[in-house]
Regions:
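DNA major-groove recognition helix of helix-turn-helix/homeodomain DNA-binding modules
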Residues: 4, 55-74
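Helix-turn-helix/homeodomain-like alpha-helical modules used for DNA recognition
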Residues: 79-82
Length: 82
């Protein structure tokens, strides 16, 4: 069985990625938090660089990016390059 390595993006890029993903999906921080199973303050802390997502949260974020197709892939490449 092959295990997938979690996506690793450092701050501040991960906060920018999360904010841009959330805005692309048209969700508020509270709505986006619900899709990831976290609280609104958690999303706020991620976006503002005060904390970073857990590996499990990053897996969920990566899944959302892939589900978006080209826009999500483009966003992923944009922040992986930084």
């Amino acid at each position: 069985m092959v295990t997938k390595k979690p996506l690793v993006i450092n701050q501040p890029a991960v906060g920018k990625l999360i904010r841009e993903l959330r805005l692309l999906t048209g969700l508020t921080q509270e709505q986006f938090a619900a899709t990831l199973g976290v609280t609104y303050p958690t999303i706020n802390r991620w976006e503002n660089g005060r904390s970073k997502p857990s590996p499990l949260a990053m897996e969920k974020i990566e899944a959302q990016l892939h589900e978006m197709g080209d826009p999500g892939t483009d966003l992923l490449h944009k922040y992986l390059a930084n």
